[in-house]
Amino acid sequence: MDLLGDQHFAAQQPPLFDATPSSLKEDAEELIAETIAAWDSIVSQIQTENATFQNTISPIIQDENVKSQKQRVLTFYSSTSPSKDLRDASTAVGRLFNDAEIELYSRQDMFERVDQVLQQQDKQVVASLDEESLYYIQKLHRRFHQNGCGIAEEGQRVTFKTKMKRLGHLVQQCNKNLNEDKSGVWLGLDELDGIPQSLISRLKQGDGENSDHLWLPTKVPFSSPAITNAKSEATRKRIYCAIQNRMEMNVPLFREIVLLRDETARLLGYADHATLKTADKMMQTPQAVEALLSEIRTAVAPLAAQDVEELLEIKRNEAESRGTTADELYFWDLAYYSARRGEAEKKISSSISEYFELNTTLAKLLSIIEHLFGTRFRRVNAAGRDEAAGSLIWHKDVQMYSVWNVDGPKEFLGLFLASSALVMNYVRPTDTRPTLLSLDEVRKLFHEIGHLLHSQWTQTKYAALHHVDRDFVEAPSMMLEQFFWVEQHIKDVSFHYSHIDSKMKDMWKATLVDQDDTNPPEKPAQLSDDVVFNLARANQSKAIQGQLKEVFFATYDMLVHKPASRAALEALNLTELFNKTRSDVYKVRGGEALGGGWEWGHGQTVFRNILNRYDAGYYSYLLGRVFAMDIFDTGFKEKTPSREAGRRYRDMVYRVGGRQAEMKTMTDYLGHEPSTHPYLAWLQVFACVVPRDMVPNTAQIGSITTETIVGLLSPVRMAVWGLLPIKWRMTRELSACKQRCLQEDGHLVALEVRLVHSRHTLAAAVGEQRVAAPGSTAYDAALRSYFSVQQAAMQPACVVLPQSDEDVSAAVRCLAQLHQGGGESCRFAVRSGGHTSWAGASNIQHGAVIDLGRSAPSSSRRTSRRSRSGWGPRGAMWVGGLTLGGGLSYTSPRYGWTCDAVSQFQIVLADGSVVAADSKERPSLFRALKGGSNNFGIVTRITFETFRQGPVWSGTVYSLSSTAEAAIDNFVAFNSATSYDEYASVMTSFVYNQARGLPVVANLLQYTKEVTGTPAAFEGFMAVPNIYSSTSVASTLATTQATAALNSGGVRSLTYAVTLVSTKEVIQAAYEKWSTSYPAIKDVRNIIFSLVLEPLPPAIYQRHATTNTLGLADRAGALVVAELSVSWADAGDDALVSSTARALVDDIVAAAKSLGGFDPYIFANYANKDQAQDVIRSYGAESVSFLMQVRHEVDPKGIFTHLVPGGYKIPEH
């Protein structure tokens, strides 16, 4: 029978799982006896002085190689077998092996021979061994030493051995208690509100006095979704306290374990257990571990505190909606309010797991492994599994795979779930519900697969070197886990279970609320781009909280294993320490806040890792993450990593195993010393890359020296391995600041130092190539491309050139974090096309500019009747400011404002999340963006409804100023609300151009319907004598380009906007004010002084008045947008031009009001940043109130109100 379902066969048979309780004991005793016999043979035949690698070490290795796999199988039953008898027998076998190893590795006679072989190598009296063999002997020697062979006095060695056996038995008993744990809590039906029905349906119904209750086990698959979703705080507290009070019998056992570890370490001559355990690991000393923990805790703490405050605010709001109050966040609240955070998470949290059915997800994960690492997984065929169920697998639910090499020879790599076993804790599928995973569980699954891969692919000479040091073991798996912080990989693996087969589809339909709907709309097969982006980004708080958890556990681990003294440890209350440390790290309280005291729970009793091989080593999870991020950043950051990258990683990391020092493995693969930079960037703790308290204030600048600067940027503050390249660049720039300080008497140099700090922090967030510094080609090009000289003259600290939504998100998060420390350097501008003229509209002095218009090749595309405007070159695609301000075009009479044609916005919010807003998803934000300027975030993509447009009749007709009255008559008649031709568009301008020395009338005419000859709507305009006409029929593109040519940039310019009622008297008055105004500035060099009239009939403003925020729904009749547009050459004329323009606007407003022809609405696209041009308030009280409400929802801290001075701001009150 071909159990492997493949034409290739393994060189040896896989292990069998056919043991009985008695056979386990017999096999274990036989293995132990064989080892003792082998060692006795060595000692009896080889004198100490004659010991060599060949006659002493090789026999030990041969015995280990044979015994290692058999021993693992015999002890495997203790945690996996469905039979309690087998579990108990396997636990007893574990005690036998533990005691036997203590006896073996405390044998002084064998230690003397091993020591002799090592000394021969050290003294080079024999031929040198290869590096792997020498490394093996060194580890073997340390193992003997740590098992008491370094203790000189025989009586102490016996004491040590006895205590080590007792220690092993205690650990096994604690584990047995944990494995047999059946704890839980009874929940009444009134306590289940919010808990998913899919979970409730799996809970056991009580009987007797609990007949109306359900039993919720404290095991993670049950308790985690319950505490995350239960609406009642009392319910959440009951569940959490039940979890924290499991295994009371382990409290004294754990205390004895800690005391014995300390005592045995001191017997070996170590200061404490932590010093013993770190001595042969990568970190080498407890002090190095403490420095790592302190560094990470310091980096994460500010954002963690912010996170807690945000969750507390959600809790307060929820309490207020229920008519109660809430003043504090507790541990049992963290998961629940984290899940309630943010619109994106709220919408997807309940259904995201539907895209990750266990078996389908596993298959997709394995396919990623196959692609990356050149392997093939073959599921053992069903017939083979059934026949082998009693021997090849230990439970009928086990899935078995064979693993083969693809690149090169068809090399067999072992049986995936026999030689290596993946044991996960999932709720079993039922006939009505499959096993569905959360995204965190998908990450965890890929993480654990990583451990299997390490086991499968490691190739060493000796079984003992197959495993790496405990503080490196997590890094390779955490690297794989990181794939699912990248949106493309999340999307690739996602697959809604209703698409798997018809049975699964029926299961899904049965979960729908509307059971009467026989044909509900199908779920998309994969998660959308927007959702996966936000899944990746919205998990920052989870990442922060996750790292806090690791800091807490690692800190507690070091506190109990590195006491100040033996007496201090004996006096230590381990339960109180556990709860106090957790509260101190999280800045959140638990039962102690409600009168329970510091012993309200004993969570240390279920701290499996500290019991099992992670004692004084839990920091490995943090160190592993640091390493993992550096590995991922080095080799797998591309969206589609190549097989070459995967094979390189497999060969240089996985294959090496523990045959050399793990730090060498890391540096060989990375090509550099490990860095915390990718880790901090992953957490988005950008402000902590260069802490703000390093930056000197003005008072410090006077005496600053280069040495002082270097001290401010010390490697200790720059993280464990430092960000030295950034440090060096900052040092050079700050040294230059110091030179300017000496030359300029210190003026503004403190500010300049802050700017350097901010720029490099941004570079750490989005990448150095995407942050242009002053003096660079990219920086200069960005400034030159502004439409107005006033904008171009501003000098930002840097220009961010994002290449993706992810870059924009990172930049926003970074700037928001910098803001926590205050300072002008944290303010920023957002630029789309850069056409607004007033200084600061989309540029900023001493801040950062996020420039969307000079970023990446255009991604505009048309699908069906929609067109997307996204990443693209300025002028070609970027219409962000135009659209957010309302926008008018020559098709507006048919379709409304430009913003009315939008079907969806994609926007980066203040918290960095990227969300879509349309009529169904976030409809309030969707409406607010239609006129609400840049108060809510950075719009990175706009999807427009499109229509087919043929050739356009268009052109400009110029006439002398003597025809002004006729022009006004024609304009008013054209703009009549009762006879407006929606295919016609007119802009009438009264223009003084110094180059021509006289005023003229210009009518820009456009007609968007195919006509023969002059359109009837324009007959009046064309009947007026003209001095030049450019009318013709041309394509839409040609017409647009011709219009753009009339508005070239590179000049000083300003605009004002006023809205008038469309009557001859009002417009005539405006014209007369203009005609008496321009003479005051007619001698200004290159002045162009224009009053532009643009029709605003009900056909435009009423068409979608209730779905935008422009506030014109209550208007009736034709209006006019009057724009004062001025350009000139010299800065020396700024004051004269500005005062003349402002006076003219005031005169026009006063005249219109006197005639009853003034409308308060101000068109944002033509407005000025002037106290009299309060654009948002001009929309009216109802719109202002609505915009304030939406701002509070999406930007409660006012990031885009306070940090972005450009645009038109929503009032504070």
From Swiss-Prot:
It is an enzyme of class 3 (hydrolase). Gene3D superfamilies: 3.30.465.10, 3.40.462.20, Collagenase (Catalytic Domain), Endopeptidase. Chain P, domain 1, Neurolysin, domain 3. The active site is at 448. SUPFAM superfamilies: FAD-binding/transporter-associated domain-like (SSF56176), Metalloproteases ('zincins'), catalytic domain (SSF55486). Its EC number is 3.4.24.-. GO terms for molecular function: flavin adenine dinucleotide binding; metal ion binding; metalloendopeptidase activity. GO terms for biological process: peptide metabolic process; proteolysis. Pathway: Mycotoxin biosynthesis. Keywords: Hydrolase, Metal-binding, Metalloprotease, Protease, Virulence, Zinc. Pfam families: Peptidase_M3. One of its GO terms (cellular component) is mitochondrial intermembrane space. Its cofactor is Zn(2+). Zn(2+) binds at residues 447, 451, 454. Oligopeptidase; part of the gene cluster that mediates the biosynthesis of the phomopsins, a group of hexapeptide mycotoxins which infects lupins and causes lupinosis disease in livestock. Within the pathway, phomG and phomG' are probably involved in the processing of the phomA and phomA' precursors. The pathway starts with the processing of the precursor phomA by several endopeptidases including kexin proteases as well as the cluster-specific S41 family peptidase phomP1 and the oligopeptidase phomG to produce 10 identical copies of the hexapeptide Tyr-Val-Ile-Pro-Ile-Asp. Belongs to the peptidase M3 family. Monomer. PANTHER family: PROTEASE M3 THIMET OLIGOPEPTIDASE-RELATED, SACCHAROLYSIN. This is Oligopeptidase PhomG'. The lineage of its organism: Eukaryota, Fungi, Dikarya, Ascomycota, Pezizomycotina.
